[in-house]
């Protein structure tokens, strides 16, 4: 049980890290901040739910209580799966945008190199 909660917490942490790394793509800073803040809020909410689920003070060790905890953990896992799917879709969209931007960037780089070459030689 505790290892399952710990594993979910690690997944949330990795999801937050991967989301923060994707923020450095050159898109509008305001959009990135909103996505980052949303991801942080979702991660905080999931971690809070995990912490609540792991507290055993007011729950007995009956089969029913264990089943309720497992149901809650399954629900949180599904939420996390949906969030990761959304993040993957956003990543794919950003990848497509980068593919579109790359030829333009390469062309500008060639132009700059040509200008420098003409100035030097």
Swiss-Prot record:
Signal peptide residue numbers: 1-22
Keywords: Amidation, Secreted, Signal
GO cellular component labels: extracellular region
Tissue-specificity statement: Expressed by the venom gland.
Entry-annotated residues carrying Methionine amide: 120
Domain of life: Eukaryota
Prosequence residues removed at maturation: 23-69
Protein location: Secreted
Main location class: secreted
TM region(s), chain numbering: none
InterPro entries linked: Latarcin_precursor
Function in brief: Shows no antimicrobial activity against Gram-positive bacterium B.subtilis B-501 or Gram-negative bacterium E.coli DH5-alpha at concentrations up to 20 ug/ml. Shows no toxicity towards insect (S.carnaria) larvae.
Family named by the database record: Belongs to the met-lysine family.
Protein name: Met-lysine-1b
């Amino acid at each position: 049980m505790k290892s399952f909660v710990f594993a979910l917490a690690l997944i949330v942490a990795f999801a937050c890290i991967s989301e923060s790394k994707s923020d450095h793509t050159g898109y509008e800073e305001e959009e990135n901040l909103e996505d980052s803040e949303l991801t942080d809020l979702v991660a905080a909410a999931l971690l809070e739910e995990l912490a609540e689920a792991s507290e055993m003070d007011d729950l007995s060790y009956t089969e029913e209580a264990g089943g309720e905890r497992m149901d809650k953990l399954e629900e949180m896992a599904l939420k996390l799966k949906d969030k990761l799917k959304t993040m993957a879709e956003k990543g794919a969209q950003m990848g497509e945008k980068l593919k579109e931007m790359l030829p333009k960037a390469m062309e500008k780089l060639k132009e700059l190199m040509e200008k420098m070459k003409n100035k030097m030689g």
